[in-house]
Swiss-Prot record:
Domain of life: Bacteria
Keyword Cell division among record annotations: no
Species assigned in the record: Verminephrobacter eiseniae (strain EF01-2)
Family statement drawn from the similarity comment of this UniProt entry: Belongs to the TrpC family.
Protein name listed in UniProt: Indole-3-glycerol phosphate synthase
Gene Ontology BP annotations: L-tryptophan biosynthetic process
Molecular function per GO: indole-3-glycerol-phosphate synthase activity; phosphoribosylanthranilate isomerase activity
Pfam families to which the protein is assigned, alphabetical: IGPS (PF00218)
PANTHER family noted in UniProt: INDOLE-3-GLYCEROL-PHOSPHATE SYNTHASE (PTHR22854:SF2), TRYPTOPHAN BIOSYNTHESIS PROTEIN (PTHR22854)
Keywords: Amino-acid biosynthesis, Aromatic amino acid biosynthesis, Decarboxylase, Lyase, Tryptophan biosynthesis
InterPro entries, per the entry: Aldolase_TIM, Indole-3-glycerol_P_synth, Indole-3-glycerol_P_synth_dom, Indole-3-GlycerolPSynthase_CS, RibuloseP-bd_barrel
Disulphide bridges, residue numbers: none
First-level EC class: lyase
PROSITE patterns the UniProt entry points to: IGPS (PS00614)
Length: 267
């Protein structure tokens, strides 16, 4: 079945091959390894939790395959500043920036602009299928990467995490079901485990995905619920179940003031 994820992965492989012809792996790796002082992504999440607040990874996303254009008035730096400022003492812990251009209208430049405009740690949100992209993430300034279990085999999960760690980047490990969770936990050491409520093959969303998987999460891991968190009731339902970390994008991208929308959602 040629589902959405298959289409994205096929396009991404071609994109990476083209990128390596323009800038060889050796050059990207050298650039990545020359960079110092990543921002503490995990630490920023845990700091919010220690204050009794929700730890929010606020996403900067112009469009998506399922919803189309989310924000026409899109200035990554302004959105990042809005998230960092928040309102009434409620603000983002970290940022997630889409760098996939073909399906999400993202850009490496958006990540650079967002990171330069504030002090928050930044996650590169993309479909990483090749070690080249891990080095590329650090070279562009990312403090963390997303590894999607549905896109990677066991060896890749372990290898990509090891590369990220060698570059002092955090890893957010994304799963959607129990088999993915079991496989990923066996291969990766990162404490940050994202539970995506969106099925990447059908793009259907259900918060019960997170609720059903919490019991399977080892205590040393920090679950991050992702996708479909749109209302204060959604937040309450998840927090009542013990969820402390959230990745949210769409609800904020449609708002005139993303930071204010964040503060209201997590008030």
């Amino acid at each position: 079945m040629n589902d959405i994820l298959d289409q994205i992965m096929a396009a991404k492989r071609a994109e990476v091959a083209a990128a390596q012809k323009r800038v060889p792996l050796a050059a990207v790796r050298a650039d990545a390894e020359s960079r110092v002082l990543t921002r503490d992504f995990e630490g920023a999440l845990r700091a919010k939790i220690s204050q009794g607040q929700a730890a929010v990874i606020a996403e900067i996303k112009k469009a998506s395959p399922s919803k189309g254009l989310l924000r026409a008035d899109f200035i990554a730096a302004d959105i990042a500043q809005s998230y960092a400022e928040g309102d009434a003492g409620v603000s983002a812990a970290c940022l997630s920036v889409l760098t996939d251009q073909a399906f999400f209208q993202g850009s490496i430049d958006y990540l650079k602009q967002a990171r330069a405009s504030c002090q928050l740690p930044v996650l590169r949100k993309d479909f990483l299928l090749d070690p080249y992209q891990v080095y590329e993430a650090r070279a562009m300034g990312a403090d963390a990467i997303l590894l999607i279990a549905a896109c990677l085999d066991d060896a890749q999960l372990a290898d990509f995490e090891a590369i990220a760690r060698s570059l002092d980047m955090a890893v957010l490990l994304e799963v959607h079901d129990r088999p993915e969770l079991e496989r990923a936990l066996a291969r990766c050491k990162t404490p940050l485990v994202g539970i995506n409520n969106r099925n990447l093959r059908s793009f259907e969303v259900s918060l019960s995905t997170t609720l059903d998987m919490l019991a399977d999460m080892p205590p040393e891991r920090l679950p991050v619920t992702e996708s479909g968190i749109l209302t204060p009731q959604d937040v309450k339902t998840l927090r009542d179940a013990g969820v402390q970390a959230f990745l949210v994008g769409e609800a904020f991208m449609r708002a005139a003031d993303p930071g204010l929308a964040l503060a209201r959602l997590f008030a």
